[in-house]
Swiss-Prot record:
Localization (cell): Cytoplasm
Catalytic activity: tRNA(Asp) + L-aspartate + ATP = L-aspartyl-tRNA(Asp) + AMP + diphosphate
Record function comment: Catalyzes the attachment of L-aspartate to tRNA(Asp) in a two-step reaction: L-aspartate is first activated by ATP to form Asp-AMP and then transferred to the acceptor end of tRNA(Asp).
Species per Swiss-Prot/TrEMBL record: Shewanella sp. (strain MR-7)
Family affiliation: Belongs to the class-II aminoacyl-tRNA synthetase family. Type 1 subfamily.
Positions annotated to bind L-aspartate: E173, R219, H448, R489
The organism's place on the tree of life at top rank: Bacteria
Protein name per its UniProtKB record: Aspartate--tRNA ligase
PROSITE patterns per UniProt: AA_TRNA_LIGASE_II
Keyword Ligase: yes
InterPro entries listed in its UniProt record: Aa-tRNA-synt_II, aa-tRNA-synth_II, aa-tRNA-synth_II/BPL/LPL, Asp-tRNA-ligase_1, Asp-tRNA-ligase_1_N, Asp/Asn-tRNA-synth_IIb, AspRS_core, GAD-like_sf
Length: 591
């Protein structure tokens, strides 16, 4: 039905007859000539109909926005005065000779031109219309090109695209599973995979030493701007490769991807340990475009007569950190109060501050409600450590070390945005040497997942002192977002059993949930390592979208619902009976 895409017609086609199909973006009658902007996924082209062909002209006069039409005509150059430099096809137009209305359109329930006026609910309910917007179409086309480039790279490096099951077994991987009831085995359930983790490890044990898959994953978790109940991973696993080799290969892939798609050279990725990232930036995925850093000052404050500082300073699990904001002395008291409320979201009890109005006047040039508790030597050392100057403000977080990291790390990001301090467009890095475990409410939990290998210890040494062990894990971070995370996997049954015991998984529970894995580890398992990238997040960053919902064709809302199809929905009683399921209705509460 077409000879060219609308957005592909250019000056090289002048004089040629073309057949185009698409949607009417805009139609206007100017002085007896109908101008039609025809749109398809590749862009817009202007079509002109004049009264010399009355039958066609009359049809053109009836066109309205979003009619689906076929156009036949001859390409001609626009006069210089009418060239539109803002359009890809702005040097030409098509003189229409024939016109077929394939389908008319009713008035749209949402605006495609002023989409900002559409609610998120509207955009998702009428997603098939929202996707007609050039911005949305370009993002999905960009996504397709990225996945094609990823496949090319991995194929050319000997990786095999192998599918793994979608109906599988529930395993504890950190989030709730989506469960699928079995009709054949009443009362039993499949789970949709949170990742192909165990199957890709089993593929390594099967001898397929380089695997990849662009795969759907499912997690029933509380949603945020960068989370969806179903999302896509670039999943990679290798045998007989060290963590350094996996990092080098996947960094090569990511650098090549940015160069091909955006003409951006990311350069060599720096390395940073987890401890350094948390100490300097309060985050294990630091945004290095932001020059602000947290500075430890607890050692200076152990003996001050101000319990807010001295308490955490003398607590092994406490921390006092200073954050210098250049030019921050201009902050009003209300703005400081707003920052105090902001850190309160992360559990901080308050925010101390020190304005450096004029350092030439010594302490007289400093304004702070805590200044009376600090001698001149302490103040000068804080100023020296933070590199603060006249006109700056120093903000202090004092609390449990975790609270300080989370609250001051978040404040660092907010202040960087508020004061326009971000430097450069792309700042990648690797974060390495993660703790093997973290303690939550007295119990150990895996920082990555239970199949991550510790670095340089025996199973006995790991169980004897799990709190201080480092994992052979690595995260790729870009502009404060985790692009992907991976690790060397445990390939020894004794080590895997030790990790399960540390996590409070009994031998019986391990056998019930992971018996197939423990069995497989007995039969010559090779050393293996891998990594999984969040494809949606990568596309979001590369296109500048504000949410992964804007780079997915049919995403869910933040409450994990689909307004387009009204999913999830109720099952009919017959289906439930076949599955052996009865629904317990919530009791009504009286007003």
């Amino acid at each position: 039905m077409r000879s060219h895409y609308c957005g592909d017609v250019n000056k090289s086609h002048v004089g040629q007859e073309v057949t185009l199909v698409g949607w009417v973006n805009r139609s206007r009658d100017l002085g007896g000539v109908v101008f039609l902007d025809l749109r398809d996924r590749e862009g817009l082209v202007q079509v002109v109909y004049d009264p010399d062909l009355p039958e066609v002209f009359n049809v053109a006069s009836t066109l309205r926005a979003e009619f689906c039409v076929q156009v036949k005509g001859v390409v001609r150059a626009r006069p210089d005065s009418q060239v539109n430099a803002q359009m890809k096809t702005g040097e030409i137009e098509v003189l229409g000779k024939e016109l077929t209305i394939i389908n008319s359109s009713e008035p749209l329930p949402l605006s495609l031109d002023n989409y900002q006026n559409n609610s998120e609910e509207q955009r998702l309910k009428y997603r098939y219309l929202d996707l007609r917007r050039p911005e949305m179409a370009q993002r999905l086309m960009f996504r397709a090109k990225v996945t094609s480039a990823v496949r090319r790279f991995l194929d050319s490096n000997g990786f095999l695209d192998i599918e793994t099951p979608i109906l599988t077994k529930a395993t504890p991987e950190g989030a709730r599973d989506y469960l699928v009831p079995s009709r054949t085995y009443k009362g039993q359930f499949f789970a949709l995979p949170q990742s192909p983790q165990l199957f890709k490890q089993l593929l390594m044990m099967s001898g397929f030493d380089r695997y990849y898959q662009i795969v759907k994953c499912f997690r029933d978790e509380d949603l945020r701007a960068d989370r969806q109940p179903e999302f896509t991973q670039i999943d990679i696993e290798t045998s007989f490769m060290t963590s350094e080799q996996v990092m080098a290969k996947t960094e090569e892939m990511m650098r090549g991807l940015f160069l091909e798609m955006l003409n951006v050279d990311l350069g060599e990725f720096p390395r940073m340990t987890y401890n350094e990232a948390m100490r300097r930036f309060g985050s294990d995925k630091p945004d290095l475009r932001n020059p602000l850093e947290l500075v430890d000052v607890a050692d200076l404050l152990k003996n001050v007569e101000f319990a807010v500082f001295s308490g955490p300073a003398n607590d092994e699990e406490g921390r006092v950190a200073a954050l210098r904001i250049p030019g921050g002395a201009s902050l009003s008291r209300k703005q400081i109060d707003d920052y105090t409320k902001f850190v309160g979201i992360y559990g901080a009890k308050g925010l101390a501050w020190m304005k450096l109005n004029d350092l030439t006047q010594g302490l007289e040039g400093i304004q702070s409600p805590v200044l009376k508790f600090l001698n001149e030597g302490i103040v000068n050392e804080i100023i020296s450590r933070t590199g603060a100057q006249t006109g700056d403000i120093i903000l202090f977080g004092a609390d449990n070390a975790i609270v300080v990291a989370e609250s001051m790390g978040a404040l660092r990001l907010k202040a960087g945005e508020d004061f326009n301090l971000l430097e450069g467009q792309w700042r990648p890095l690797w974060v390495v040497d993660f703790p093997m475990f973290e303690k939550i409410n007295g119990s150990f939990h895996a920082v990555h997942h239970p199949f991550t290998a510790p670095r340089g210890v025996t199973p006995q040494e790991l169980e004897a002192n799990p709190a201080n062990r480092v994992s052979d894990a690595y995260d790729m971070v870009l502009n404060g977002c985790e692009l992907g995370g991976g690790s060397v996997r445990i390939h020894n049954q004794e080590m895997q059993s030790a990790v399960f015991r540390i996590l409070g998984i009994t031998d019986e529970e391990a056998k019930e949930k992971f018996g197939f894995l423990l069995e497989a580890l007995r039969y010559g398992t090779p050393p293996h390592a891998g990594l999984a990238f969040g494809l949606d997040r990568i596309i979001m960053l590369m296109t500048g979208a504000s949410s992964i919902r804007d780079v997915m064709a049919f995403p869910k809302t933040t409450t994990a619902a689909c307004p387009l199809t009204n999913a999830p929905g109720f099952a009919n009683p017959q289906q439930l009976a076949e599955l052996g399921i009865s629904v317990v209705k919530a009791a009504k509460t009286e007003d």
